[in-house]
Structure formats: structure tokens, C-alpha cells
């Protein structure tokens, strides 16, 4: 049932099928096409053409990815790392994170409230809450600020 990606038309069709499901970055789309058996000689021109036509857009992909992860409660550090692992340039990632309209501190408070809903009673609980929030991708500085301001209330 696997289609053979040995012509430019087949590679373009496979790329468009993937893009129809969700936005992809160029590196991710190239990797997926290679996994399906397409050669680099066919992939690069197809992706160049899709980019020229506006169907493959890195900035749109970054915006979509950041918004999706932010809605899931992930912080900027985790999002930045996930995007870097997907082969996107750091400068583009930083630009997209700077342009997004997410209030990271408000989101941090909301993630904390949904998960814990009560102040840490001792150092062990405070460390547990801090580890969870750090794993979600928030900076230790903002976590400390949140937990210390909460314990002062």
C-alpha cells in the first residue's frame, strides 16, 4: 500500500498530503518524505516550489507550533528546545517566540493553579511543584517568583 515516491509529482503530492493535515517545517517535511522513500534530488525542488507558492511557510509553522504548545501549557524554554530539535534555526525560533502574544507569566500561574491549586506546605512540595513547572518549560526565575509570591500571600 506504500506509494513509491520516485517522480516529482509523487513527491509533491505526498508533501501536500502532509501539509494538508497540519503545518510542517521544511526540515521535518524533508525528513518525512525521505522516510517514505523519496530521494533528496526530488525533495529539494518540490519543497522549493511549495515554498514559492506559499504552501510551505516556516514562519506560519513556527506560529502554529508555538500557539499549539502554549495552549497545552508548555513554557517558552520547552517550546524553544522542541523547535530546535526539529531543525529550525535559533534566530527564527527567537523571533517567533518574541512575536507571539502569549503572556507567559499568566500562563505559568494558570498551569500551576490547574495542577496544584494550593500552596506548597513544605520544601519537598515546593521542590515538586518547581520540578513540574520546569519540566513544562518555564524558567527557574519565574517559577521562584511565582512560588515565593504565593507563599508570601
Swiss-Prot record:
Signal peptide: none annotated. Gene3D superfamilies: Winged helix-like DNA-binding domain superfamily/Winged helix DNA-binding domain. Pfam families: RecX_HTH1, RecX_HTH2, RecX_HTH3. Belongs to the RecX family. GO terms for biological process: regulation of DNA repair. GO terms for cellular component: cytoplasm. NCBIfam families: PRK00117.2-1. InterPro entries: RecX_HTH_1st, RecX_HTH_2nd, RecX_HTH_3rd, Regulatory_RecX, WH-like_DNA-bd_sf. The keyword Cytoplasm applies. Modulates RecA activity. Coiled coil: none annotated. It is found in: Cytoplasm. Its main location: cytoplasm. Keywords: Cytoplasm. This is Regulatory protein RecX. The keyword Cytoplasm applies.
